[in-house]
């Protein structure tokens, strides 16, 4: 019995050890966010709660019919039954909204959790690296593509096309000419250009043209970097959010989304499985013990039945002698149900012979009374105590009916006293 009580005591522990899928969200200060929560069953209470300092306590933020005071007009809950999930929208986020949340279903907020959400609110997003095509030397776009894309920002490219028939080159290696210009403006011995093309004149008479085009090139480079940085930041942010949201419902419904196979550790399933197996083993032992007891009891009952059947004929009490003829009971005798006394000798001669043969030292025997028939008189049946009265009538002693007798109830006063000695016997 103690073992069963311990098992029932530790069964709720298996629910607390369940590992919830976790989603991490990073939102800008003052922005909004959508939290997708799984909905394993419909027509139940849906909620989003916030975990307090004590991990065992989770305060409800929003549910089907409730919104916490601090989150009113900022949090909404929208069920989506066809997708088996419900959405929680949080707007106007502040630093106080940062923390750990959990969404779930059921009437009990602490036991029905299905997902854990970690929300981070930042003032500004960190600097992201430059686009990947800025670092690769072989991924430069052609000049004509830039002309169609940004015609107003690249007027110097059109000038370069008409001024220089030699075109654009990716890598140029030249020897520094001997001029009187200051050494600061002289290029190095080997010069490599891998980002943006430059125009070089065929003669050395116009050395100031490339220097005049440097501001336009710098402005274009700065604007291109800023545009690519914004695009990359937005793309990286959405990609990260999508990648973090995928395990949330992928683990519940198929674990596969857009070709991404996500594996989540499910070692927590082993605990209830082991407990269930242990309960099955104990139940089997109890059933086996009950069957053994039932079989032992049936064998014991069978042995007792056989023993009683064997002793039955030997313990039968004979109600009457087999050789004695049955005497029919008189139908008119209303006292036939009362017990009968032992029969007296049939005649007087036999009684007298017994008296003569008795030894002299023996005490004198009581006088024998021969019972004869008595006229029928109505009796009052008050009890089963009867008085037998008899006298010697003037009839033949050898009469067959002389031994018949009747019983009359013992009355306090007898109606009459017939002549002769009439000792009473009970």
From Swiss-Prot:
GO terms for biological process: Fc receptor-mediated immune complex endocytosis; humoral immune response mediated by circulating immunoglobulin; immunoglobulin transcytosis in epithelial cells; negative regulation of extrinsic apoptotic signaling pathway; negative regulation of lymphocyte apoptotic process; regulation of B cell receptor signaling pathway; signal transduction. The record marks 386, 405 as: Receptor-mediated endocytosis. It comes from the Eukaryota. This is Immunoglobulin mu Fc receptor. Residues 178-212, 306-346, 401-426 are annotated as: Disordered. GO terms for cellular component: cell surface; early endosome membrane; external side of plasma membrane; lysosomal membrane; plasma membrane; trans-Golgi network membrane. Keywords: Cell membrane, Disulfide bond, Endosome, Golgi apparatus, Immunity, Immunoglobulin domain, Lysosome, Membrane, Phosphoprotein, Receptor, Signal, Transmembrane, Transmembrane helix.
């Amino acid at each position: 019995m103690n073992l069963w009580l311990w098992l029932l005591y530790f069964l709720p522990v298996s629910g607390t050890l369940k590992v919830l899928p976790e989603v991490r969200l990073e939102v800008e200060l003052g922005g909004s966010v959508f939290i997708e929560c799984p909905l394993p069953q419909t027509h139940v209470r849906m909620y989003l709660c916030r975990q307090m300092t004590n991990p065992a306590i989770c305060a409800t933020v929003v549910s089907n019919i409730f919104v916490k005071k601090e989150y009113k007009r900022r949090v909404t809950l929208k069920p989506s039954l066809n997708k088996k999930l419900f959405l929680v929208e949080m707007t106007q986020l502040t630093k106080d909204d940062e923390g750990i949340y959990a969404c779930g279903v059921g009437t009990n907020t602490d036991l029905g959790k299905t997902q854990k959400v970690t929300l981070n609110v930042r003032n500004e997003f960190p600097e992201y690296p430059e686009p990947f095509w800025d670092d690769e030397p072989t991924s430069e776009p052609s000049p004509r593509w830039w002309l169609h894309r940004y015609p107003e920002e690249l007027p110097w490219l059109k000038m370069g096309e008409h001024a220089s028939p030699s075109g654009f080159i990716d890598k140029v290696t030249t020897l520094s000419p001997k001029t009187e210009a200051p050494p600061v403006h002289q290029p190095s011995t080997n010069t490599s250009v891998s980002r943006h093309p430059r125009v070089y004149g065929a003669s050395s008479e116009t050395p100031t043209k490339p220097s005049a085009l440097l501001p336009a090139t710098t402005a274009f480079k700065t604007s291109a970097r800023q545009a690519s940085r914004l695009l990359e930041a937005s793309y990286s942010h959405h990609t990260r959010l999508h990648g973090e949201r995928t395990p949330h419902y992928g683990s519940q419904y198929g674990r596969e989304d857009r070709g991404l196979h996500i594996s989540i550790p499910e070692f927590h399933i082993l605990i209830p499985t082991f407990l269930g197996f242990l309960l099955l083993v104990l139940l089997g032992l109890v059933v086996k013990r009950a069957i053994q007891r039932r079989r032992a009891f049936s064998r014991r009952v069978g042995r007792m039945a056989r023993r009683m059947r064997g002793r039955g004929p030997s313990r039968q009490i004979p109600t009457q002698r087999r050789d004695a003829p049955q005497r029919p009971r008189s139908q008119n005798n209303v006292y036939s149900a009362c017990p009968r006394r032992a029969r007296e000798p049939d005649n007087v001669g036999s009684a007298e012979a017994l008296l003569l043969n008795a030894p002299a030292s023996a005490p004198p025997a009581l006088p024998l009374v021969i019972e004869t028939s008595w006229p029928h008189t109505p009796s009052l049946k008050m009890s089963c105590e009867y008085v037998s009265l008899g006298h010697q009538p003037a009839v033949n002693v050898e009469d067959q009916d002389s031994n018949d007798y009747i019983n009359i109830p013992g009355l306090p006063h007898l109606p009459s006293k017939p002549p002769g000695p009439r000792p009473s016997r009970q």
